[in-house]
Amino acid sequence: MNSLPRLILFLALSLPLCAADPNDQSGVALEVNSPDPKLAKIVLLAGGPSSKPMAHEYFAGCALLLDWLKQQPGVWPVMARDWPKDEQVLAGAKCVVYFGDGGGKQPFIEPSRWARLSKLMAGGTGLVLLHQAVDFPKGPDGDKVKSWLGGVFHGDIGCRGHWDMDLKPVGTHPVLRGVKPFAAPGDGWLFNLHFADKDKGFTPLIVGQVPDKSRTSADAKKHAGRDEVMAWAHQRPEGGRGFSFTGVDLHKSWSYESQRKLVMNGILWSAGLEVPADGAATKFAEADLNRNLDKKAAPAPKTGAKPTEKKK
């Protein structure tokens, strides 16, 4: 075969890949209930479109978790947008994971859904909240989340922002199996949360230094130089587990192997499952980051810039 036919064949095979729509989410099967009650059901709730492209990619992030959880033995992951249309998929769930907007925008705040979630938590179902999903208004609901998860963000003392972060594991908790220190440049973070007491099941997992200029609350300013907790685990005294990681603002951060292990381990542990000795294995390729993205408008150009002078 000479070079021209080879080139034509190569282009023909490459065309479908080049034409793949990164916003096509039709390939993600939603609300597929478990066929076997012996499998550990983990329900992933993906929030709606938010922020700019490649940030707050809740659907795409949950789709990645869905794929990786399918690779774990004895697990049946179920994914839904916001909240299941068929609430039966929640029955028997070992863990509920929500990756989406916080600040009272969580889809389970609505009273009937809150009652359903509360019943699951009372029965020992695990809870995982990622990034700003930990942000709840002060009040009884926020107190409940703190008791389920081990921590909650309130604007009275909590701080948030974007900066380069060097993260390090602390302790020997099962969620840290296979997790090594890692950097997450430019990601978004929440810190200085209201945490449960350590003698009531709270365990810090990942800590790091934050810029002093990001300590925007009076309380946070009192602790300049302190390592801040960015991920934690919680063993509820009454039964059930919780895990949270406040990063994962930027979609590219899923490319960090230790972050993938941390989140996957946290989900498995919260579901009451044994975390593998080397942490949960995940198959990953850079192309995975360009799949199942939400359709979002590009950010508007910044105002205030001086117009470029035309050459005379």
Residue ranges and their predicted role:
Residues 1-3:
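N-terminal secretory signal peptides that target proteins for export/translocation
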Residues 6-16:
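Bacterial N-terminal signal peptides
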Residues 20-37, 61-67, 71, 212-214, ...:
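Extracellular ligand-binding/catalytic regions of CAZymes and related secreted enzymes
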Residues 22-29, 154-239:
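Catalytic beta-strand/loop cores that center a nucleophilic Ser/Cys/Thr
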Residues 24, 31, 44-45, 50-136:
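Helical hinge/lid and interdomain linker segments adjacent to catalytic or ligand-binding clefts
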Residues 103-181:
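A glycine-rich, often tryptophan-bearing local segment used as a flexible ligand/cofactor-contacting loop or short
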